[in-house]
């Protein structure tokens, strides 16, 4: 795997890493700060944000920075903050350093944060946001925020540090002195992240470096291999490491395969290119896709995770050294001295789509479609209560309150759980008086003393922050006035824990007593990416219960911790392992999302969304995001719920939403403006208004999704990049005009091909291999190359 020559040249790479790279420090002066919403006051060199007793007040300060980067370079934003008076609790985005980016190409990245605790006992704390941009940045907006909480907080010493030394390149965000580094054999490098001046060192398989031992089992496969990796600490202390596997690329024109519609040619001196997204932990971001791919002269090379054995990872291509690499951020601790995971190396042809097809062939279980029928998602509401419910295409029911009726009418019923959360309502004795986290803690301890299972699970599972405090916060929502406690979802925590209380053996035996399809059809996992859950859990008592590797914090200490994305993966994987043998399914809200390993264990994905803003202006999801969700779902159903004000979401908006769904074979659905009240399907005046749209478009979504999306379109090509074409099964193609104007597009297909069109009707002929369609903005067409099939209605 790595010969002597490889070790020698990797040593050259390691030696080329430099410390003390030149930085420009920009102090964010208070005179340049602008008010955010209700603003701030100044006390000397400090910013003061005082919300008083108003829990709805939003205030803070904001700076605008013009960066105008010619190449992507990392920078850090830092401030210090303390709470003088607040409700208590642990770190929250409501009290944070917050950074938004606008790239030079106009794209954006919102909401990278360093969070603080609204707890006066914490004193001054530093918060740092490390930005590792995927492409050059035009500008950044930096916020010091205190939103939706009572009390008063202070910020001081805000500053930005930017790497500006012209003769430096970056290798996985580490400065590298430019030079003609020779190409080398593939192999591993390791860096000790807790040492700021530490570079990469080669580490041989079966050998040691920087106090860790590396073991690798290689399983060759057609056009590639799978590597099972174990990293073991030999020092007995906390560790924060980045392990890199680097694969040299041959000579030739280099292309970064960014996504199914984007290929980026790279010059030999181009900066590193990656798909990683910021997660607020580790030494860098987390890959959005489960693999990274490049092409050289038309031949493809890719590295990706094994979804059965994931770790926190990113892939990147480094043109100056002609390396494709995969980097793993690994935490090790006395409580968990090893990290075990697996990744794949493979070749392909056909750009990103060919890479995705090749990856899916290596991960057949991850992309397997298990549900026999597909349709739209109904949250909570009894389907039988909807007038002429058959018109809407219901198939998946969130909530098991009418299982017998669902069985009789072909509806798949899912039991609701929400991992990581315990919504604790406070006693009515509190009335309208404000309560604190201390009050909520006292109630939990009282319940635990009485033997309450939820409280006992809290004792074994509650997450801990960097100070060892239990993670929770005061909440006032339509469904709970009290506190939310955040719990580890790991299924193998000893004793009573979150997973075992919410997923008892007795419940599974009862719900799945009879063979499918009789009874409950699966488990519904809400908030599967834990939108309220902190990124890291520092509870050392549960480190050993984790099967997946630890990661580490991105602050100055780089402490080992559990990453919620991997802990939630273990929850979902365990649930799938229990229901699949029973012929049942897993449905999850928020999947596919930001964690590329989670879709592998989800049979029905979906999300709650808003495609209009508060004023009712149309704000659709990007086509990049829509295609990402379809691609990682492959042939599995993906379902939407619009959570909007349905008086503002007009008939035309609903039709446009459904046309977008048809283009990608996704399922349109509706819920509530606040995910609780005013359920769409309790309101005949709105669902009857939209009934014709459901009857027209949902059968098309079903036809396409059940046929199965194909990453490689072999039927039709578009000559206009603004007109998207996607293939489903062997015979269907969707055509969508994303342009803001009507276009006449030339489509190419096999000479003599003919297709029926299922949206507006009629036939499309490719007599000479070309057909022309005139499409209005956001118009969709569905071509069916089997002319004998009637239009579904």
Give, region by region, the residue ranges found by the protein language model.
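Extracellular and organelle-lumenal recognition/adhesion modules and their flexible linkers in secreted
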Residues: 16, 22-212, 222-224, 235
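Short strand-edge motifs at loop-to-beta-strand transitions and within beta-strands
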Residues: 61-63, 125-129, 324-326, 771, ...
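Carbohydrate-recognition beta-sandwich/jelly-roll modules
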Residues: 161-166, 182-439, 521-522, 531, ...
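Active-site-proximal substrate-binding groove within the catalytic cores of carbohydrate-active enzymes
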Residues: 334-344, 406, 564-746, 751, ...
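The substrate-binding groove and active-site-proximal loops of carbohydrate-active enzymes
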Residues: 374-397, 477-514, 519, 553-568, ...
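Active-site-adjacent "subsite" loops/lids of carbohydrate-active enzymes
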Residues: 412-518
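Active-site neighborhood of glycoside hydrolase catalytic domains
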Residues: 503-597
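C-terminal beta-strand-rich structural cap/linker in extracellular carbohydrate-active enzymes
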Residues: 767-793
């Amino acid at each position: 795997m790595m010969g002597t020559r490889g070790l020698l040249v990797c040593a050259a790479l390691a030696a080329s890493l430099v410390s003390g790279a030149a930085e420009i420090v920009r102090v964010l002066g208070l005179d340049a700060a602008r008010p955010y919403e209700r603003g701030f006051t100044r006390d000397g060199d400090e910013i003061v944000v005082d919300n008083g007793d108003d829990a709805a007040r939003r205030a803070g300060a904001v700076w605008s920075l013009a960066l105008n980067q010619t190449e992507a370079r990392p920078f850090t934003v830092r401030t210090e903050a303390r709470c003088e008076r607040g409700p208590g609790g642990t770190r929250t985005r409501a009290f944070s350093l917050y950074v938004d980016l606008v790239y030079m190409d106009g794209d954006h990245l919102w909401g990278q944060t360093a969070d603080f605790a609204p707890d006066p006992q914490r004193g001054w704390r530093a918060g740092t946001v490390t930005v590792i941009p995927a492409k050059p940045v035009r500008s950044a907006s930096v916020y010091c925020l205190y939103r939706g909480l009572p009390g008063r907080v202070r910020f001081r010493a805000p500053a930005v540090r930017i790497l500006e030394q012209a003769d430096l390149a970056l290798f996985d965000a580490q400065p590298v002195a430019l030079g003609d580094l020779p190409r080398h054999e593939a192999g591993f490098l390791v860096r000790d992240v807790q040492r700021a001046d530490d570079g990469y060192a080669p580490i041989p398989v079966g050998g040691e470096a920087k106090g860790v031992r590396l073991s690798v089992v290689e399983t060759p496969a057609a056009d590639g291999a799978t590597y099972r990796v174990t990293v073991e600490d030999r020092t007995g202390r906390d560790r924060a490491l980045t392990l890199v596997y680097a694969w040299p690329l041959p000579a030739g024109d280099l292309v970064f395969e960014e996504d199914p519609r984007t290929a980026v040619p790279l010059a030999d001196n181009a900066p590193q290119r990656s798909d990683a997204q910021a997660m607020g932990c580790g030494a860098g971001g987390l890959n959005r896709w489960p693999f990274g791919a490049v092409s050289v002269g038309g031949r493809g090379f890719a590295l990706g995770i094994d979804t059965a054995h994931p770790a926190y990872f990113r892939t990147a291509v480094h043109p100056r050294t002609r390396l494709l690499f995969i980097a793993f951020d690994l935490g090790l601790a006395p409580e968990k001295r090893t990290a075990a995971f697996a990744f794949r190396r493979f070749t392909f042809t056909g750009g990103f789509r060919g890479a995705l097809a090749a990856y899916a062939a290596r991960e057949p279980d991850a992309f397997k479609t298990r549900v026999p029928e597909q349709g739209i998602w109904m949250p909570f509401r009894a389907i039988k209560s909807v007038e002429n419910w058959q018109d809407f295409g219901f198939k998946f029911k969130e909530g098991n309150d009418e299982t017998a009726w669902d069985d009789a009418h072909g509806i798949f019923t899912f039991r609701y759980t929400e991992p990581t959360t315990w919504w604790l309502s406070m006693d009515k004795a509190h009335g309208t008086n404000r309560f604190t986290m201390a009050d909520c803690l006292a109630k939990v301890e009282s319940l635990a003393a009485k033997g309450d299972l939820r409280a006992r699970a809290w004792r074994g599972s509650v997450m801990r922050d960097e100070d060892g405090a239990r993670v929770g916060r005061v909440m006032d929502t339509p469904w709970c006035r009290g506190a939310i406690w955040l719990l580890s979802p790991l299924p193998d925590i000893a004793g009573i824990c979150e997973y075992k209380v919410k997923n008892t053996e007795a419940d599974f035996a009862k719900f799945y007593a009879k063979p499918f399809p009789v009874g409950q059809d699966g488990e519904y996992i809400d908030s599967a990416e834990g939108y309220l859950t902190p990124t890291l859990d520092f509870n050392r008592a549960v480190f050993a219960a984790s099967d997946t590797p630890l990661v580490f914090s991105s602050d100055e200490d780089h402490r080992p911790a559990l990453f919620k994305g991997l802990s939630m993966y273990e929850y979902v994987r365990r649930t799938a392992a229990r229901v699949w043998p029973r012929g049942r399914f897993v449905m999850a809200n928020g999947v596919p999302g930001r964690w590329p390993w989670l879709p592998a264990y989800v049979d029905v994905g979906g999300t709650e969304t808003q495609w209009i803003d508060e004023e009712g202006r149309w704000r659709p999801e990007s086509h990049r995001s829509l295609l990402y969700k379809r691609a990682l779902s492959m042939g599995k159903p993906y379902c939407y719920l619009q959570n909007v004000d349905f008086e503002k979401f007009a008939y035309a908006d609903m039709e446009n939403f459904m046309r977008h769904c048809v283009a990608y074979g996704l399922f349109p659905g509706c819920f509530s403006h606040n995910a609780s009240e005013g359920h769409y399907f309790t309101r005949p005046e709105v669902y009857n208004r939209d009934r014709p749209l459901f009857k027209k478009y949902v059968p098309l979504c079903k036809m396409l999704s059940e046929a199965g999306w194909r990453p490689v379109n072999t039927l039709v090509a578009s000559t206009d990049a603004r007109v998207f074409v996607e293939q489903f099964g062997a015979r269907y193609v969707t055509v969508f005009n994303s342009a803001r104007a009507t276009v006449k597009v030339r489509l190419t297909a096999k000479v003599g091909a003919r297709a029926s069109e299922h949206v507006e009707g009629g036939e499309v002929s490719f007599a000479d291999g070309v057909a022309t369609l005139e499409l209005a903005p956001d118009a969709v067409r569905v071509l069916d190359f089997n002319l004998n099939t009637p239009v579904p209605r």
